[in-house]
Amino acid sequence: VEVISATSDQMFKDFMPYSKHPELPVFDGELLMDVHGTGCYTSQAAMKLYNRQNEVLANAAENAAVAADWLGTATYPLNTLTDAWKRFIVHQFHDDLTGTSIPRAYEFSWNDELISLKQFAGVLTSSVSGVASQLDTRVKGTPVILHNAHSFPVTDLVEVVLDMPKSPKGVTVYDEKGKKVATQMLSYENGKARVLIAASVPASGYAVYDVREGG
């Protein structure tokens, strides 16, 4: 047996193009597990969506809560997280998550999933707020704190809504090093300015941006 360390898509790259491997079967419809499992990959899509959302949000909440507790800005919410984990993870079995329970069962399952989502979101919000309250936000304009819940650095467009008493002619945004970053004023209405920022935030970290009026 030869073990190769590679990315998840390497197998497909090695076999492409498909025309060179006519021996590979073609599946049309459900990808069955031998002779059973029809519908398990597609039935009850909402249940699968809620489950995945809980997995992602739970990880983000756990990471943020640990950081907040370690920094002393919030106490680790053990009971809340344990309750949220147990409530949604109990549905990760056959028949519930696979989509093969009776329809009536999902009225209860969806409720559990949504309760856990709310609990994880609450932990994430309070933990991030605790850490953010201790960051240095002494900037010339309006400070904007961004949090990256992923375990890898993220560079992406971020839309923020800022309170501004009057419509600005434009906005300029600077990062923590004082470097100007790409930004766009999207709209202004009722004292609220929608601003798009090309931001970069470290893995499981925070970044403070300085938003100033004027182009």
Model-predicted regions and their roles:
Residues 1-146, 156, 167-186, 190-207:
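Catalytic-domain carbohydrate-binding cleft regions of carbohydrate-active enzymes
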Residues 147-151:
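Noncatalytic alpha-helical scaffolds and linker/capping helices
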Residues 207-215:
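Short, hydrophobic/aromatic-enriched beta-strand segments in well-ordered soluble domains
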